[in-house]
Amino acid sequence: MTVAEMSASRSRSLRWFGVAAGLLLLQIVILYAMGRIPICECGYVKLFEPGVNTPGNSQHLADWYTPSHIIHGFLFYWFAWLLFRNKPFSMRLSFAVLIEAAWELLENSPIIIDRYRTATTALGYTGDSILNSAMDTVFMALGFLFAARVPVWLTVVIAIFFEIFTGWLIRDNLTLNVVMLVWPVDVIKEWQNALPQM
């Protein structure tokens, strides 16, 4: 590869990283237009919200659902690699950000908020703060970057650990979240409802 080709490749990569950042910014703008609150109504920001079915859940920088978004990054990395393995890494990252941002917008729409409230244990869920939603996308991107730099087996082990740990601790994880959102199971809901208040 010549110097000119390397320069052009670097320029394309930077443009795609710019696209990823632009998608995150667009997510924030659309959430604001949807009427989402910028930060928790409590008026302050926590690094981590330890509660599950509490008013602070999904309102701060991170919470017990953050591992699920990191796993999103693992999954999106593999998916993007399958679809665009010969494309720039930064383009694949932009693709992942697009999917995550689209989900975040859907998740904070009335139809999905109502679905969470009726089909899952999240009876008091009113949607994410803009800060929390944006950080979900950031954590997905971190998971994507991590998956790009470590062996597949390590990514799989960490994903399984996250699922088992959060499943044990809060009786919820990415797998259970998808199941309860798509095809609610009463036995699982009863088990989750029996979780002691955290």
Swiss-Prot record:
Coiled coil: none
Compartments, record wording: Cell membrane
Main location (coarse class): membrane
Membrane topology reported for the UniProt record: Multi-pass membrane protein
Any one of the GO CC terms: plasma membrane
Keywords: Cell membrane, Membrane, Transmembrane, Transmembrane helix
Ranges annotated as spanning the membrane: 14-34, 64-84, 150-170
Keyword Cell membrane: yes
NCBIfam families xrefs: PRK00944.1
Family that this chain belongs to: Belongs to the UPF0314 family.
Protein name: UPF0314 protein Atu8092
